[in-house]
């Protein structure tokens, strides 16, 4: 994906407020050997771009001052209750250096799995994204996870999925093989009393006062 940015000279609260009032969003680009660069982006174009999953998880082409450079979206600040982007951060990408990025997981085939189709279980995604390490050219927009063979009583772990070529998982917290998807059994129906079973004895009637 690509987007257009413009150089921004002024900074500070007042300058940023005036910029937002004119339909622009202040931002910054940092990283690499170059100095941090103040930028501004058209708010409407940015707002629509942020609705796309790929804008958050892909290497982006940023057009700035007649040049195109590779960047990653690193931070977005939203207004608490208005549909307004207050500030945005991008990081420059070195094509020869590995990067760390969270990539969305796309789950497919759950309805065809024995767990769902036969045993009427529910599939519960424990994780919706995966932290990975790879070269910029190998960064996938998403990772497809096939659930068609998932069975009742089984969970899908990190080592059960096939990652794209050149992509390695980044595991933190001591869990080398975390659960990505769990299977939830169906809620057991309340069993009706067997036909012919003795009915419970009625409670004794209370005696009235004399």
Curated annotation (Swiss-Prot):
Pfam families reported for this sequence: Ribosomal_L25p (PF01386), Ribosomal_TL5_C (PF14693)
GO BP annotations listed: translation
GO molecular function: 5S rRNA binding; structural constituent of ribosome
InterPro entries: Rbsml_bL25/Gln-tRNA_synth_N, Ribosomal_bL25/Gln-tRNA_synth, Ribosomal_bL25_b-dom, Ribosomal_bL25_C, Ribosomal_bL25_long, Ribosomal_bL25_short, Ribosomal_L25_dom, Ribosomal_uL5_bac-type
Keywords assigned by UniProt, alphabetized: Ribonucleoprotein, Ribosomal protein, RNA-binding, rRNA-binding
Renumbered residue ranges of the record's region Disordered: 191-210
Cited SUPFAM superfamilies: Ribosomal protein L25-like
GO cellular component: cytosolic large ribosomal subunit
Ranges of biased composition (kind: Low complexity): 191-200
Assembly behavior: Part of the 50S ribosomal subunit; part of the 5S rRNA/L5/L18/L25 subcomplex. Contacts the 5S rRNA. Binds to the 5S rRNA independently of L5 and L18.
Function: This is one of the proteins that binds to the 5S RNA in the ribosome where it forms part of the central protuberance.
Entry's family note: Belongs to the bacterial ribosomal protein bL25 family. CTC subfamily.
Matches recorded under PANTHER family: RIBOSOMAL PROTEIN L25/GLN-TRNA SYNTHETASE, ANTI-CODON-BINDING DOMAIN-CONTAINING PROTEIN (PTHR33284), RIBOSOMAL PROTEIN L25_GLN-TRNA SYNTHETASE, ANTI-CODON-BINDING DOMAIN-CONTAINING PROTEIN (PTHR33284:SF1)
NCBIfam families recorded: bL25_bact_ctc, PRK05618.1-2, PRK05618.1-5, PRK05943.1
Protein name, UniProt field: Large ribosomal subunit protein bL25
């Amino acid at each position: 994906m690509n987007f257009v940015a413009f150089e921004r000279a002024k900074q500070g609260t007042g300058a940023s407020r005036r910029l937002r009032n004119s339909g622009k969003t202040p931002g910054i680009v940092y990283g690499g050997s170059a100095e941090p660069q103040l930028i501004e982006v058209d708010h409407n174009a940015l707002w629509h771009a942020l609705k796309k999953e790929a804008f958050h998880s892909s290497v982006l082409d940023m057009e700035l001052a007649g040049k195109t450079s590779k960047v990653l979206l690193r931070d977005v600040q939203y207004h608490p209750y208005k549909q307004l982007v207050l500030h945005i951060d991008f990081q420059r990408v070195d094509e020869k250096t590995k990067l760390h990025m969270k990539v969305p997981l796309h789950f497919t085939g759950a309805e065809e799995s024995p767990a769902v189709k036969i045993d009427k279980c529910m599939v519960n995604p424990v994780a919706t994204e995966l932290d990975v390490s790879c070269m910029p050219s190998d960064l996938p927009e998403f990772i497809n996870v096939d659930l068609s063979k998932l069975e009742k009583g089984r969970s899908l772990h990190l080592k059960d999925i096939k990652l794209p070529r050149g992509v390695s998982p980044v595991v933190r917290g001591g869990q080398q093989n975390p659960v990505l998807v769990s299977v939830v059994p169906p809620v057991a129906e309340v069993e009706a009393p067997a036909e012919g079973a003795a009915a419970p004895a009625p409670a004794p009637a209370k005696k009235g006062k004399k």
